[in-house]
Structures are given as C-alpha cells and as structure tokens.
C-alpha cells in the first residue's frame, strides 16, 4: 500500500440537523454556531502554519460538512489554502448526507476542488433507515449518488451499516447488491456499535434493544468481505473496500500507517513526531479558547517505544498490508506467537510481512495484547 511523503489535514465540522441515536461523535444541532466555529477554525490554523509544511490529503468530516452553506465552505477552503501548502494531487474528501444535497451542491463542491465524496447512505432499506432515524430515504440516496456521478466525480464512496437488530443476512445482501450496482469506487461497512451515552445505549440499558451477538456479527462480517471481494473490491482495511489500489482512501490510510496528520476543530486529533494531541470536545469551550488566543488542546501524549511498537501492530493488523516482520526481531517469544497465529489461520506471511486473514480481522483489536511485555 501507499507510503506518504506528506501529512494529512482533517477538519471537524460538528453540525447536524438532528443527532443520530447511535452517534457518539462530537456534534451539535444548532446551525447558528457555524460563524463562531468558522472564525475559531481560522484562528486555530495560525498555530500550525509553520509546523506543517505541505499536505496531500484534506478531509472534511463531522458532523455533516455538507450542511455548511457554499459561501462558508468556500471561505474555509480559501483560508486553508492561504495558510497551508497542498500537493498538486491532493485528495480532497467531503462527507455528505443524501438529504442535504441540492441539485447545485455537487457542482459547487466540484468547483471548490473536492475530488472525493463520502456519502452516508447507511442502508438501501427504508425501514432500516427509519430505525436509524436517518432523515433521507432510499430514493434520496440514489438521487444524491446520481448527482455526484453526473457532476463528474470519479471517486464516490458509500458508508453502509450492518448489525441492526432484526436485520437478516438476506436484507443486508440486498443493500450490498444495490450499493455495488452503482459501481462506487469505495465502500465502508461498519457494524452498528451501541455506545453507552447515546439514545440507543439508553434503550439497551433498559432492555428495549438487543445488539447483535458476537457470532452473528462475525458471520455478517465474513459475508460482507466475501461478497464485495467477489464483486472486485479490495478488502484493504477492516471496514473498508476499494475498487482497485487507486481508490484507497489516502487520508484514512495515514491513520493506519501512523503517518503525520493535523486535526482542526473540536475533538480533532493530531499526530506528529511521536506525539499525539487532541482538542477540546465542547464546541463552545473550543471557540472560547481560540477567542482568547489560546490553543484549544485538551491533552497531549508522547508515545514510548513500547507504545509505538504495540500501536504499529494494532494498526497494521487492521489492514491487508499487515505488519513488517522486522519489528518482531529480537523480541523474545514473538516467533512462537506468530506461529500460533498462523496455525490458527489468523495471519499468513507475504514476503517480509505478517498479514491478517479475514478471520484475523475479526480479532485484530486484541492481537497486540499477545505481544505486550
């Protein structure tokens, strides 16, 4: 997979019309705060314009970046370009919701320089969309998808969700069938995760909602991988599939490859030179700090060599590129662990790399514990 000459830039746009009942990301439903957020983002840029020289990926995530009025998107983009340098082939991604897409929005994003779209479809089943409290319908999702294709976007990705209570393999396959019928360049498939402090979390605590059990969730995962690979998609990261190497998400690969990246906005994370820092989560507190001329950083950590080692394993085993076998050299007991993982068909060896199987993807988050001192 790709190695990176430049860091990536992420901007968190924390605005939503309504809060989805499963979402634990930082977001607010008051759009009246957009001007304050935009001014704060401009101020935050000043802290980093000499620290990061050039980017080759720009990702607007949320929240719902497509909610921003065109003039505010243009203003944000102008200031980013004024303060930072970008490579000529920069990947510029914007997350969008189908119900926010007017007939003019695709062309406006294209003219701004956006060259990659991540469309939050979640399902091609209207009943499932209602359960998820999504504001769009299947017809709106199809219309948005057609709009971006008609506007000339060569890279459109779909976000889908499985593991909903009552969902069957056949209903999930129907969503996958419909998704692939549009030939999107990228598909992300996430299992519904019920977080404690969300409305779904409250329902689970009250016994009114039962998430998928682990065995069924694993079956859905394998089904997804097999289906999409048969359709010609590379299963290049646990939740992500691309139609060829050229359609991998460059920006997100930076996270998994431990490349440097800068995050602007409330709750955004950054990483550079072995240090990681993260911003204040609350929008009002974030804006106030910047209005007072202070960096909005909530915390910072410098990784120890052992943390770097374990994080490299954790992130590497999330991707089909795996982990360079060299990092295990002179680590007592690792050869035996690797042999056990191979016998269990969780990993295999490709050249000088240890690569997870689909079965290995299922337990990737727990594998670093085996290598901890």
Locations of the language-model features?
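Minor-groove-contacting beta-hairpin "wing" of winged helix-turn-helix DNA-binding domains
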Residues: 353-357
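Local cysteine-cluster metal-coordination motifs and their immediate loop/turn environment
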Residues: 14-25
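Conserved N-terminal Rossmann-fold NAD(P)-binding element of oxidoreductases
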Residues: 11
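C-terminal scaffold of the Radical SAM
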Residues: 4-8, 27-48, 54-329
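Short amphipathic alpha-helical interaction segments
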Residues: 329-343
